[in-house]
Amino acid sequence: MKNAALNPDVEKLLQEGTVIPAHPLALKPELTIDEDRQRALTRYYLACGAGGLAVGVHTTQFEIRKPEFNLLETVLRFASEEIQEEAKKRPLIKVAGICGPTNQALKEAELALKYGYDLGLVSLGGLNTWSDAQLIEHMVSISEVIPVFGFYLQPSVGGRLLSFEYWRDFVEIPNVRAIKVAAFNRYQTLDVIRAVSLSKRSNEIALYTGNDDNIVADLLTTYRFDINGKSIEKRFVGGLLGHWAIWTKKAVELLNEIKQCIADNYSGVDKLMSKGIVVTDMNAVIFDAKNSYKGCIAGIHEVLRRQGLMEGVWCLSPEEKLSKGQMEEIDRIYKEYPAFTDDEFVKQFLAAEKKY
C-alpha cells in the first residue's frame, strides 16, 4: 500500500515548529489502562496549546506491544478520537511510534494510518546487529506506507548508535519529513544535522530536538555549514520530548519565547539560556539521569500524579519505578522552580473537566 501525502497544513506546522509531547500511559493499579485519565491527558495537552502528540513511543512504554498487554491499538485509538474535534479548529500533528523488525513495523505503520496518524516515528531499538544498508532498506519499506519521522534514540533507553553515513543515506528517502534527535550527545546530534544540511532535501526535513538535556540551547542554535562555497543553515524548529509530557503549558510558552527571541535578533537570549539550565536541572531529576534514566518514565508519572492527571506511577515493566532519592529530588525542583510548573493551569483544567 502506498501512503497518502502529508496534509499541507500539517506539513506547514511541522516545518514551522511546535510542541509535540510524548504521550504517557495512564494505568490502574492492576496495570490495565485507565481510559478516563488516558483520554483526559490527551485533552490536557491540547488545552495547553501543543501542536501535536506522539503516541506509542518510548514514553508510552514499549511494553504496550507485548501480547500480555496488547495496548498499542488502544492508545492510538484513544488519542486519535480525542484529537478529532480539536483538529477541526487547527492543524495538529499526529505521530505514531513504530518499532521492531520490518514485518512488525509495517503492521504498525498500517495501524497508524487506520487511526489517521500523519507520521511514523521509527525507533531502531532492538535492531543493533543490522547494517546501515539493512536499516535503510527497512526505512524505505516503512516510508512507502507512512511519512517517516526519523529518530535517533540514545542507547541508554533502548536506542542504538547510528553512523553519519546512515543519516546521509536516510535523508535521501523521499518520504522522510522530520527527524527527532534524542542522542543526548553533541557529536551525534551534529552528525544528523550535518547529514541533513548536505542533502538537497535539507529544506524538506524538519528537525525536532529530543535532547531533553539540552532543550533550550538546541532550539536557539543555528547550525551553519559551508557546502560547495555556499553557507547552509539548519536549526531545530520544535521539540518532540518526554519532558514536554509534563508542565506542557510552560513548554508551549517557552517555545513561543524562543521563537520571539530569534525573530528579535536574539534579544533576551541570556535570560533564555539561564532558563535552559533550569529546564536541564528539572529534567535531570525527572529523567533520573544519575541512575542512567532508570526512573525516567516513573518520574514523568509522579509529576502527573501530583497534579491529579494520573492516579499512580505504575508502569508495565516492574523495572520502571522511581529510584531511591528521586522523590526527594522532585520535591526540591518543585520548591526551587515553582514558576516552571503549570500546576495552577492543571487545576483549572481538571475543574473544567469536572471528573476528578
What are these regions (language model features)?
Residues R39, E73, R77, L106, ...:
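Generic alpha-helical structural signal
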Residues Y45, A79, I83, V196-S197, ...:
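Hydrophobic, Leu/Ile/Phe/Ala-enriched alpha-helical segments that form helix-helix packing faces
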Residues E144, Q154-C296:
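Catalytic alpha/beta core domains of metabolic enzymes, predominantly
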Residues A50, Y117, N175, R201, ...:
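Residue-level recognition of short, well-ordered coil/turn positions
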Residues K2-W167, E319, D343-Y356:
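Active-site beta->alpha loop and helix N-cap motifs at the rims of alpha/beta catalytic domains
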Residues I83-E86, R90, L198-I205, I262, ...:
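Structural alpha-beta junctions
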